[in-house]
Swiss-Prot record:
GO molecular function: ATP binding; tRNA binding; tRNA-uridine 2-sulfurtransferase activity
Keyword check for Transcription regulation: no
Binding site for ATP: 16-23, 42, 132
PANTHER family: MITOCHONDRIAL TRNA-SPECIFIC 2-THIOURIDYLASE 1, TRNA 5-METHYLAMINOMETHYL-2-THIOURIDYLATE -METHYLTRANSFERASE
Organism of this sequence: Shewanella sp. (strain MR-7)
Catalytic activity: S-sulfanyl-L-cysteinyl-[protein] + uridine(34) in tRNA + AH2 + ATP = 2-thiouridine(34) in tRNA + L-cysteinyl-[protein] + A + AMP + diphosphate + H(+)
Gene (UniProt): mnmA
Location(s) in or outside the cell: Cytoplasm
Record protein name field: tRNA-specific 2-thiouridylase MnmA
EC number: 2.8.1.13
């Protein structure tokens, strides 16, 4: 690994330390570049059982151990109230409305790059903040700053960060975005950081790993109903539409049906008026396919957005292959998007994120699908 010449002596960076390997290596790399680095550990959820408490305590312990190893300060802050008001209530409202939200995107918008940045500015006098996200920033000669996909295609997290403003991107550093994941772990191991082999976190942003059905049921009353085929035959019962999403294959409890072929069953629609879960066989069932979508709540990182008719691509979920598409603006806050080829399992409530090459342009929320 080539050494990095220090070029940023004196600039203060507050790194969001999660207790994971990505933030650990981010702090180390920034120190190598000459920044004055301090860590900040966020507590964003009030744990309500012992397992959660232990996991959160372990993350803080690991973050402290890494900061001790690197010789930097670790601050802590509690954003639980902000998380509840700005992320979790939105999450519940979307599920209640029958949509499938992405809390990680809202969490980045409201907590990691807003509440965190404000705290780093007002309390810790930071020049920049830094996170362990796999994205890159590019500073252009004209003074603009763009957000790019991470070098590691499999770990690229730009989909989750499309709501960042130009100003937020300009104040943020993403050291691991220039690296592959295996390189990050190798650096952590070489530096003797205890997080080098720590498993990547999954689950809902800050709420951690838990049984989703049980967790959601604590906050929203489930409404059981029928499962029907696309042809209208009742073949089972569901415990609540909110527990299911378009394209879902597992957990339907309808295997081994008589008079059906061997193709697996998928959720192809949710009938909110009748509280019916509609299923069909095969991952390309006609009810599962869309020719396009209407997208609203638009946000463009550079404030301008793509030009109508330009050759760009879209992702309608994380780690999806790029989808070539054509855009038409219906108004300042609504897009009509037509796919070059039909796409399966496009889900209202999820985010559509647009790219021009490696540049993440921004996106919006999928509102309605175009079928037929």
């Amino acid at each position: 690994m080539t050494s990095i010449e220090p070029t940023h002596t004196g600039k203060k960076v507050i790194v969001g330390m999660s207790g994971g390997v990505d933030s650990s290596v981010s702090a180390y790399l920034l120190m190598q570049q000459g920044y004055q680095v301090e860590g900040l550990f966020m507590k964003n959820w009030e744990e309500d059982d012992n397992d959660e408490y232990c996991a959160a305590a372990e993350d803080l312990k690991d973050a402290q151990a890494v900061c001790d190893k690197l010789g930097i300060k670790l601050h802590t802050v509690n954003f639980a109230a902000e998380y509840w008001d700005n992320v979790f209530e939105y999450f519940l409202a979307e599920y209640k409305a029958g949509r499938t939200p992405n809390p990680d995107i809202m969490c980045n918008k409201e907590i990691k790059f807003k509440a965190f940045l404000d705290f780093a500015d007002d309390i810790l006098d930071a020049d920049y903040i830094a996170m362990g996200h796999y994205v890159r920033r590019r500073d252009n000669a004209d003074g603009t700053t763009q957000m790019l996909r991470g070098v590691d295609n499999n770990k690229d997290q730009s989909y989750f960060l499309y709501t960042l403003s130009h100003e937020q991107v300009a104040r943020s550093l993403f050291p691991v975005g220039e690296l592959e994941k295996h390189e990050v772990r190798e650096i952590a191991k070489k530096m003797g950081l205890i997080t080098h082999d720590k498993k990547d976190s999954t689950g809902i942003c800050f709420i951690g790993e838990r049984k989703f059905t049980e967790f959601l049921g604590n906050y929203l009353p489930a409404q059981p109903g029928n499962i029907e085929t696309a042809e209208g035959e009742v073949i089972g019962k569901h415990q609540g539409l909110m527990y299911h999403t378009l394209g879902q294959r597992k957990g339907l409890g309808i295997g081994g049906m008589k008079n059906s072929n061997d193709d697996p069953w998928y959720v192809v629609d949710k009938d909110l008026k009748r509280n019916v879960l509609v299923v069909g066989q095969g991952g390309h069932h006609p009810r599962l396919m869309s020719n396009g979508m209407f997208v609203n709540q638009l946000h463009w990182v550079d404030r301008k957005g793509p030009v109508e008719g330009s050759q760009i691509v879209v992702k309608t979920r994380y780690r999806q292959q790029d989808i070539p598409c054509t855009l038409t603006y219906l108004d300042d806050n609504t897009l009509k998007v037509v796919f070059d080829e039909p796409v399966a399992a496009v889900t209202p409530g999820q985010s559509a994120v647009f790219y021009d090459g490696d540049v993440c342009l921004g996106g919006g929320i999928i509102d309605q699908l175009i079928r037929g």
